[in-house]
Amino acid sequence: MGNKFTNISTNLRNSWLTAKSGLNNAGQSLAKAGQSLKTGAKKIILYIPKDYQYDTEKGNGLQDLVKAAQELGIEVQKEEGNDIAKAQTSLGTIQNVLGLTERGIVLSAPQLDKLLQKTKVGQAIGSAENLTKGFSNAKTVLSGIQSILGSVLAGMDLDEALQKNSNELTLAKAGLELTNSLIENIANSVKTLDAFGDQINQLGSKLQNVKGLSSLGDKLKGLSGFDKTSLGLDVVSGLLSGATAALVLADKNASTSRKVGAGFELANQVVGNITKAVSSYILAQRVAAGLSSTGPVAALIASTVSLAISPLAFAGIADKFNHAKSLESYAERFKKLGYDGDNLLAEYQRGTGTIDASVTAINTALAAIAGGVSAAAAGSVIASPIALLVSGITGVISTILQYSKQAMFEHVANKIHNKIVEWEKNNGGKNYFENGYDARYLANLQDNMKFLLNLNKELQAERVIAITQQQWDSNIGDLAGISRLGEKVLSGKAYVDAFEEGQHLKADKLVQLDSAKGIIDVSNTGEAKTQHILFRTPLLTPGTEKRERVQTGKYEYITKLHINRVDSWQIKDGAASSTFDLTNVVQRIGVELDHAENVIKTKETKIVATLGDGDDNVFVGSGTTEIDGGEGYDRVHYSRGNYGALTIDATKETEQGSYTVNRFVESGKALHEVTSTHTALVGNREEKIEYRHSNNQHHAGYYTKDTLKAVEEIIGTSHNDIFKGSKFNDAFNGGDGVDTIDGNDGNDRLFGGKGDDIIDGGNGDDFIDGGKGNDLLHGGKGDDIFVHRQGDGNDSITESEGNDKLSFSDSNLKDLTFEKVNHHLVITNTKQEKVTIQNWFREAEFAKTIQNYVATRDDKIEEIIGQNGERITSKQVDELIEKGNGKIAQSELTKVVDNYQLLKYSRDASNSLDKLISSASAFTSSNDSRNVLASPTSMLDPSLSSIQFARAA
């Protein structure tokens, strides 16, 4: 018995493979037939050639074929002339069962007769008398063919609706007709397939006494316990409910909640009704066949049917319509600004969503039926042939639908394509996608107008130039991919606006911004004395883009980006005092990235700035920068961004204001331009579009070099910078970090900023301000001025020659403590911060201990000055320290401050000191409140603190 069932199982497997191969071939033929039928009449014709002779001994008989065709409503046409001869040139009607004419699908009577003459088929049909209940063999064959072709023909109705540019509701109705057709034809097919499946596998005897097995087409009325008003109508009701829900989803005027509800209704109707109907029908077959119908078996069947249904598919469809709804809302604003692309995207989502809803409903029903039959077959070899054939025919129909679905999607996409092309034609050839960026920019401008109009006041500039880079937009990218117009899309577009006295001006007459050539010209300043050039968003590198769409697979395309790059931005300024913040100008290009999106190979875009007249300020960015300051007092700032420590060596410069600045930017994150890929899907078609955009990418360390000309002051970074001055007058500000500053020759202005700095004035009359931190200060030769404030920390000063001064700019002289510590003079303020003047007493002590010692150095500071101009000389300090045994008494300091003669002397002397410090203030640090350059509140650099510089006299 075991071997018998093994042989049966093997036979079933071989039969299944044969059936599968045949069904696949049939599916291809049917699809081809359907495509050819688009322009022909949709009817089935039984074609009988003139003078055809048939063998009544072997065949079914021409009379039976004609009778069966008439019963089934198939037109019978006998060849009288050559009016349908063209059928022979289509699918070879004389050689095949199926053929095409301009009037419809042709069934070849000779080929059908040959089919019926085959031994296996003839025997199979002949032994099915009890099951077919009097139907002839011919009618069985014709009924099955008619059922399958009916589905194909209904599918052609849907295709025809698409070809006529029907709206979404029409498409849904066409889908409904297809659903109804499938319900009817699946039922008819099962009747036919039951008979064939039973006999082909030589198991007919097992089923000959199964009452009602072939009655599904008659709504199961022959099954025990079920009539056409119950179970059969449930099947129809479930499928029709699903199709009705598809209509709701197609209604663009329906609310979002209703559409979401429809999506769940679609799933629930199919899951509920189809599971119940299919499971009950299959159980009834098993009962009729005398097979088990226990709880576990019923559960297996029901669960298998349920698993064949995917509610997530319907949820995805509902999401599509929700997305379309949100796009429609989003599109309203941009439509008013002249761009309707978002609405086109919504139209695409609605159209494809409708198609998805219809096809998914049909496929769900087919999957449920096939799954249920297969589950029933799991416990019985008897039902296996039926299961295989049912699965096969539903698979053929599903395949046809899926192939049709892609064509439907492409049709919707083609409509979008045509609308874009038509718009460009009607608008003088303007790029549709560029128009989209224009609309995005205008919306952004409207949203930020209040902020922008306030910039003149906030930035303290008569004119503000705002440059905005509109970067890649995913909706625009989707539209370009769907419409197959990726070659026309741009990575973005740059815009410029001007504001004066809180008014928005047309900037095209005031500013030249040419991203293709790399030109930014703001030299036409008009009456404006001050202007601020603000890069609101990262500006992409200059150059032009070209794209090329290539096919990489059956449904895969990529639009490659080719960039004709310009190697530099050329910036031109005029007579106004201008501020440029270049930190938002992208200079680094990520040429090669690793798997983690880290930049491992870069390219650089240089900035060349010609500033002209005026007192200008430039904040340098991440790459090589060349600056010609021109006339005026010009500052170059490295205090914004995190672009490496400076090394400046101007010792060999032959022209004042000329510097070479070397920077090493350590590994970290910095603004880079990189190329990415946007993906848009149209059913199976995948469109990839390359585009460039800015991003903070992790990079390896790199070197960069800046060339400065006619620059009066350099402000350093937050790193440990090194400054070596020229033989001319230099002005350096270390900023944050532990900086080393050497003024070299010239009358230098040196500021340490934050951090424990080392500053050496070198030769010349230098102004030295250590700033916050414990600084080591050396004046060198010349008449030097040192400044200390409360909160600056503990400074150490070494001085040798000249008439030097130390100003405690926010402390009263009488509040300070003077005392001798070893060879040094230590001055302590009220915050207990100490300024140590190294070796103040060393020469005097050497003179006391060494006979005939002659002093060779003067390590003292000649005047120490309080915040109100009161002062004490080095001579007075020596006398009072001597008098107080190493410490000046507070009362003595008070006398010094209160002494009229000393005050009078202080007033007279203050004039000269005031002039000196006033001169020094022209070279003040960016830490000076008078030099803190305004930025929009949202863009303020916390490293630029405001420290009031109080004059010492």
Curated annotation (Swiss-Prot):
Gene3D superfamilies linked: Serralysin-like metalloprotease, C-terminal
Spans of repeat Hemolysin-type calcium-binding: 715-732, 733-750, 751-768, 769-786, 789-806
Superkingdom of the organism of origin: Bacteria
UniProt subcellular location: Secreted; Host cell membrane
InterPro entries: Hemolysin-typ_Ca-bd_CS (IPR018511), Hemolysn_Ca-bd (IPR001343), RTX_C (IPR013550), RTX_pore_form (IPR018504), RTX_toxin/Mannuronan_C5-epim (IPR050557), RTX_toxin_determinant-A (IPR003995), Serralysin-like_metalloprot_C (IPR011049)
Keywords: Calcium, Cytolysis, Hemolysis, Host cell membrane, Host membrane, Lipoprotein, Membrane, Repeat, Secreted, Toxin, Transmembrane, Transmembrane helix, Virulence
Pfam family name, one: RTX_C
Keyword Membrane applies: yes
Topology within the bilayer: Multi-pass membrane protein
Mod. after translation: Acylated by LktC. The toxin only becomes active when modified.
Gene Ontology biological process terms in this record: killing of cells of another organism
Residue spans crossing the bilayer: 230-250, 297-317, 359-379, 381-401
Entry GO terms, CC: extracellular region; host cell plasma membrane; membrane
Molecular-function annotations in GO: calcium ion binding; channel activity; toxin activity
NCBIfam families: RTX_toxin
Function: Pasteurella leukotoxins are exotoxins that attack host leukocytes and especially polymorphonuclear cells, by causing cell rupture. The leukotoxin binds to the host LFA-1 integrin and induces a signaling cascade leading to many biological effects, including tyrosine phosphorylation of the CD18 tail, elevation of the intracellular Ca(2+) and lysis of the host cell. This leukotoxin is a major contributor to the pathogenesis of lung injury in ovine pneumonic pasteurellosis. It also has weak hemolytic activity.
Additional free-text comment from the UniProt record: The lktCABD operon has a complex mosaic structure that has been derived by extensive inter- and intraspecies horizontal DNA transfer and intragenic recombination events.
Family, similarity comment: Belongs to the RTX prokaryotic toxin (TC 1.C.11) family.
Recorded domain comment: The transmembrane domains are believed to be involved in pore formation in target cells. The Gly-rich region is probably involved in calcium binding, which is required for target cell-binding and cytolytic activity.
Record-given protein name: Leukotoxin
Taxonomic source organism: Mannheimia haemolytica
Source organism phylogeny: Bacteria, Pseudomonadati, Pseudomonadota, Gammaproteobacteria, Pasteurellales
